[in-house]
Amino acid sequence: PGVPGAAARSLPPAPGASPRPRPAQGGGVFMARTKSFTRRSRELPPNLRRTWEAVAPRYVIEPRRGVGRTTVAEDFALDPAEVFGRCAPLTIEVGSGTGEQLVAAAAAHPDRDYLALEVWVPGIAKLLSKAAGAGVENIRVLEADAAQALPHLLDDATAREVWTFFPDPWRKARHRKRRLVSGSFALEVARLLEDGGVWRMATDWDDYAWQMRDVVEACPLLDNPHAGERPDPADPRPDHGGFAPRYEGRIVTHFETRGLDAGRRAHDIVGARIPRA
């Protein structure tokens, strides 16, 4: 059976095919928005296309689209209880990559539900292959720009946890405005979290780790439960700390291994939702 309340996810165009143009809705003019990701190929090799055709209806949500392949129409919303067919604690992963972390968590915790937002179609296809191979049913995937979609996709206090593991670091100074973790995104995550819920982040770029820590501590709706802990001598504020121990549920993915092999270390950062009045 397909995902309740959603059409089966359409396949990306075959290699060499021209995608159908998408006109602006309502005759409006589309205004470019700074994105936290780069445009990557949507083409799938034959084996991943077969996987997509076979299992996408079980896992992939097809929303009404706005302007652009990764945008979600502002009048489209998800009801997790309808989508998953039950009421269970929800974790949202922003940027699931190939699904190593997500599928491992879903297999370990069948009593929880997991919603992935990802823009890289080959990564989604690999996630689907892993999910089907593991036999997990508590995953749903949405091809979407999270920063654009989340403000209208889900109700307040929907999620137990939000994960942002190893987002694009945008290393060049002129590109850092593209980083996903920002003050405005923190407010959106806080809106989604239930009281006491947590935002878990990890990065292996030191300056992004310091930024994540600073974003959490500047957000009026989040608390850093590890304030002052694990000071980093390389930090511009070396005595400040504010870093969490490694989350026990965060596996060492292929992506993290590449960073370790390059001599980078991972920082974990946590923001806890301050209870609503």
Predicted regions and their residues:
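S-adenosyl-L-methionine
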Residues: 28-92, 100-109
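SAM cofactor-binding core of SAM-dependent methyltransferases
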Residues: 89-148
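A short acidic, Gly/Pro-enriched loop at the edge of an enzyme's catalytic core
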Residues: 151-161
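A short SAM/SAH-binding and catalytic strip from SAM-dependent methyltransferases
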Residues: 159-179
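A short glycine-rich, Lys/Arg-flanked "PGG" loop and its adjoining helix->strand segment in the class I
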Residues: 181-195
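Conserved beta-strand signature within the Rossmann-like core of class I S-adenosyl-L-methionine
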Residues: 195-203
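Class I S-adenosyl-L-methionine
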Residues: 214, 218-277
